[in-house]
Amino acid sequence: MKRDKKELIVQQVTEKLEKAQGIYLTDFQGLDVAKMAELRNEFRKVGVEYRVVKNTLVKKALENVAGGDRLAEGLYNTTGVAIGYDDPIVAAKVIEKFSKKNENLKFKMAAIDGSVFEASQLPQLASMLSKVENIGRVAGLVNNMVASVPMVVNAVMRDLVSVLDQVAKQKQ
């Protein structure tokens, strides 16, 4: 590969990594073409981009990313890079689910908002709520609070009427 092409790839990967909320490194050695296509489709469904780029080029691109120096430690053997732009957790869920069915996919490391996670931390990452799940939970809490406001107001009004009624009886 010529130097110009390498520089272009580094520039493109750097731009993608700088925009990313979550960066995941995987080892895909032993996955056949059909399994790789299936993995890419799973990532695509949740809005994650999966790329295979030479380790030396990814290492160069990671120089400008928070946590990139630590993440570069995971650049060995064959490396696939999963880049999550909207939700940093969904990629972990895909990797965990896919690696249970395909032992040839191995999680190496991840960086989420500058924090680096080791391979042993994949189950914890995958068990975290995704952005959509968190929004749903907050919406449910807000909905419950809004629904309870009329009941609280009615209870206060009922108690006020009761107190006023008792005060009126005492004055008589």
Curated annotation (Swiss-Prot):
NCBIfam families in alphabetical order: PRK00099.1-1
UniProt key word ATP-binding: no
Name of the gene encoding the protein in the UniProt record: rplJ
Listed GO CC annotations: large ribosomal subunit
One of the protein's GO biological processes: translation
Leader peptide range in chain numbering: none
Function text: Forms part of the ribosomal stalk, playing a central role in the interaction of the ribosome with GTP-bound translation factors.
Protein name as it appears in the record: Large ribosomal subunit protein uL10
Species in which this protein is naturally found: Prosthecochloris aestuarii (strain DSM 271 / SK 413)
Gene3D superfamilies listed in its UniProt record: 3.30.70.1730, 6.10.250.290
Subunit structure of this chain's protein: Part of the ribosomal stalk of the 50S ribosomal subunit. The N-terminus interacts with L11 and the large rRNA to form the base of the stalk. The C-terminus forms an elongated spine to which L12 dimers bind in a sequential fashion forming a multimeric L10(L12)X complex.
GO terms of molecular function: large ribosomal subunit rRNA binding; structural constituent of ribosome
HAMAP family: Ribosomal_uL10
Keywords: Ribonucleoprotein, Ribosomal protein, RNA-binding, rRNA-binding
Family the entry assigns: Belongs to the universal ribosomal protein uL10 family.
Top-level taxonomic group: Bacteria
InterPro entries: Ribosomal_uL10, Ribosomal_uL10-like_sf, Ribosomal_uL10_bac, Ribosomal_uL10_bac_type, Ribosomal_uL10_CS_bac
